[in-house]
Amino acid sequence: MRRILSAVAIVAVTAGIAACGSSSSSSPGSGSGSAAAASCSNSGIQPELFQKGQLTVATDKPVYPPWFENNNPANGQGYESAVASAIAKQLGFKPSQVKWAYEPFNASYAPGPKKFDFDINEISYTPQRATAVTFSSSYYDVQQALVALKNGPISAKHTPADLKAYIYGDQVGTTSLAFITSEIQPTAQPKVFQTLNDVKSALQTHQIDALVTDTPTAQYISSSEIPGTEMVAQFPSTGEHYGLLLAKGNPLVTCVNKAIATLKSDGTLQQLQKKYLQTYLSVPTIQP
């Protein structure tokens, strides 16, 4: 649910995706230091870990489908849980060596040291966030989508011009909130809430006309969470993508990027998207 990426930033991220070797680049997704020069095996990355002998992976709570299943990030079910498990395996960790930790979404990209190796929580790369933390290369390319009450005015009238007249709400600090302001540009300022659950409650109680979030989440909300709602449509891609979040300058990112590149080239990410996300993605797109 998390932000717009400029064409310049896309180039910067692409340039930062490197094999597991040394690098002097400071662009997002690049790495330097001992991990960049060392082997990306389990033993080679031990000096870079938050706790030696284990991979510490963070996310928020509660967690939701299709990204996680049964509110249990450690079970390997759901797209992000499965991706984290696959990356851990690429880095040489057994399931018993992976520890999940709690990190609130808004705290994850704040400056300062981190009590995890990486965070996976539908966190979009943005240049602003990248001043405080380091992002991996993309593990999922994002489109935003619109959720509204069924048979409301938005269902019938949702051209870009129509959308400016409605009242929106979203979670503080999210790229979905930024998307409302920068892309939809409604006449009224969107309402801001502390959690996604608060946003969903506002929709149910008619405090807002619609919310915006990533397409799989929007489809899940409308099909399984809030009766009487629908995903109206998704918006065209802006280049937004989700990356793993690491402490600023953490050289482990180079080996994480190598793992992601392997999962892309061998078809694993595509298979996981088909398994967990495909049913959520066949939706119409709002045309400019």
Regions found by a protein language model. Name each.
Residues 37-119:
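Extracytoplasmic small-molecule ligand-binding "clamshell" domains
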Residues 98-110, 154-155, 191-205, 240:
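Short helix-initiation/N-cap motifs at beta->coil->alpha
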Residues 21, 81, 90, 152, ...:
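Extended ligand-binding regions for polar small-molecule ligands
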Residues 85, 96-160:
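Acidic, polar ligand-binding/catalytic clefts
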Residues 19-32:
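Bacterial lipoprotein signal-peptidase II cleavage site
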